[in-house]
């Protein structure tokens, strides 16, 4: 994790198009410079009526590879992301995998390639 900050003010208001918005921004960076950004709109929470099932139509989740899934899992747990289960090794032994949900309930598949 390279950034975990609360952002607010004119710049964020202008960028989002919403006045008085407060955003928690978390940035995760891998060793090769790849980055993912997670946003939580703290000033404008939206209730999650139901979480989308993984078999729903449309984009149900996105996947990303990580270098060390156990470390990533611990870091994301510390940021209070919700996981379906702990990381597990695939039946073929080629990958360690788990699913979590971001602050808005979007499913994220995390994969560590083992072989």
Describe the predicted segments one by one.
Residues 18-24, 102-109:
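Short, structured secondary-structure boundary patches
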Residues 30-34, 40-107:
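Vicinal oxygen chelate
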Residues 1-33, 78, 91:
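Core segments of cupin and vicinal oxygen chelate
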Residues 110-115:
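Short beta->alpha transition motifs characteristic of CBS
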């Amino acid at each position: 994790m390279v950034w975990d900050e609360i952002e607010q003010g004119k710049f964020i208001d202008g960028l989002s198009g919403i006045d008085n918005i407060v955003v928690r921004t978390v940035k995760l960076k891998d060793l090769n410079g790849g980055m993912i950004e997670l946003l939580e709109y703290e000033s404008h929470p939206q209730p999650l009526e139901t979480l989308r099932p993984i078999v729903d139509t449309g984009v149900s989740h996105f996947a990303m590879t990580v270098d060390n899934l156990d470390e990533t899992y611990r870091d994301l747990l510390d940021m209070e992301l919700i996981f379906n289960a702990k990381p597990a090794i695939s039946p073929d032994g080629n990958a360690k995998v788990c699913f979590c949900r971001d602050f808005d309930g979007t499913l994220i598949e995390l994969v560590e390639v083992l072989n």
